[in-house]
Regions:
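Basic, Lys/Arg-enriched alpha-helical interface segments
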Residues: 1-74, 83-88, 96-121
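Conserved catalytic cores of phosphodiester-cleaving nucleases, focusing on short active-site segments
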Residues: 92
Length: 121
């Protein structure tokens, strides 16, 4: 896992860590898309309340999504709040969203990665 460096440490509302799958997804993106995703995550982590950038997923228990639109492409990173560390959000993995709803397989994958995270703590 790796952490994202946030702009103003004293204003951080929560910290974000990336599981390996999320890191690999980001690493494989074009640099400008990756930069925009990090920028949007930092804005939300520093206190911006914007459901266009970070919102609870519909119909999924306790999963959230970081949302970025860049160059006409919808990028998503699914995440959850760590139950012990109340100010920690864990990004499980990312994908390019092609449909209105989040595909069920992505929800299942995020839930499996969340389980793996807690088992390794």
């Amino acid at each position: 896992m790796h952490k994202i460096l946030l702009i103003m440490e004293s204003l951080i509302q929560f910290e974000v860590v990336f599981m390996q799958e999320a890191s690999e997804f980001l690493k494989d993106l074009q640099p400008q898309a990756r930069k925009k995703i990090y920028y949007n995550i930092a804005k939300v982590a520093n206190g911006l309340k914007d459901s266009d950038l970070f919102k609870k997923t519909d119909g999924a228990s306790d999963l959230w999504e970081f949302r970025t639109l860049y160059d006409g492409i919808q990028y998503r990173l699914l995440a959850f709040w760590d139950e012990q560390e109340k100010r920690l959000v864990v990004a499980t993995h990312g994908f390019v969203k092609k449909t209105w709803k989040i595909p069920k397989k992505e929800i299942v994958r995020a839930e499996a990665l969340r389980k793996k995270y807690y088992e390794s703590k």
